[in-house]
């Protein structure tokens, strides 16, 4: 049977995406969560009921938060399962829209495998949430895109959700740790409620700096080339290319990885054995539909380009 080259490329890229490359910013996130988990396990093993604590990860869109959290939770879930605590110790979900107290509760119940009528009142839904968290012995609940908890913009709704999160963490029978990840607006939610903030450890993913992080990005590029079995062209390993790549990714770590993978995909599709600048040029063009004069992998003065813009053309500048 003949294998479709496009399907083969998709599979190879999927395997590369599944591979998580450890980076400096991941280490404090991993260490903080490990401490929280060990404290929670110690309480369970000794039969003590202490309030749980949580972890909040903030950063700009494209900073790589989702990939870091997904890898962290996958690893910790497997570890806890191996130690006999089951495979449902950590529940992860994306904050729904609208992020009302009732809708968040319903979404969490569904993640716990329980369906409920939308006619039920919020207090009843959250009583069920606490019951099922306890019955399934869930240790942590992760809410991704947690900045949306404040999307309705009303203090009342924000206060209600923050209060319920604190209630989960201080439950007198089965306290549950809360993990929040989201954009920098998440910080406003924590600062709005000091009681919630004091129960959270915090990590922030900063934007990259071309001057400070170009070499790190080149190391990352080499690592992906090795896994993809591609030879990096000499010009790709220059400091200038590292700076171009960071700028093209709007200074965001997660977008750097996306661009690298998209360039590798172009090399696979063209059946090239080496990764070169032409693949990055094409990847950026496909991502933004920009003309050559607005492609940071082509022009000399690439810093003048606003890499957050798409459809950039000579007669249509932002």
Show which residues each predicted segment covers:
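Mid-core helix/loop region of P-loop NTP-binding domains shared across ATPases and GTPases
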Residues: 2-5, 100-104, 114-164, 168-175, ...
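Post-Walker A helix-loop "phosphate-sensing" segment adjacent to the P-loop in P-loop NTPases
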Residues: 74-85, 113-116
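Hydrophobic anchor at the beta1->P-loop junction of P-loop NTPases
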Residues: 57
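The catalytic "switch" region of P-loop NTPases
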Residues: 150, 161-236, 240
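Hydrophobic positions on the alpha1 helix immediately C-terminal to the Walker A/P-loop
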Residues: 68-72, 104
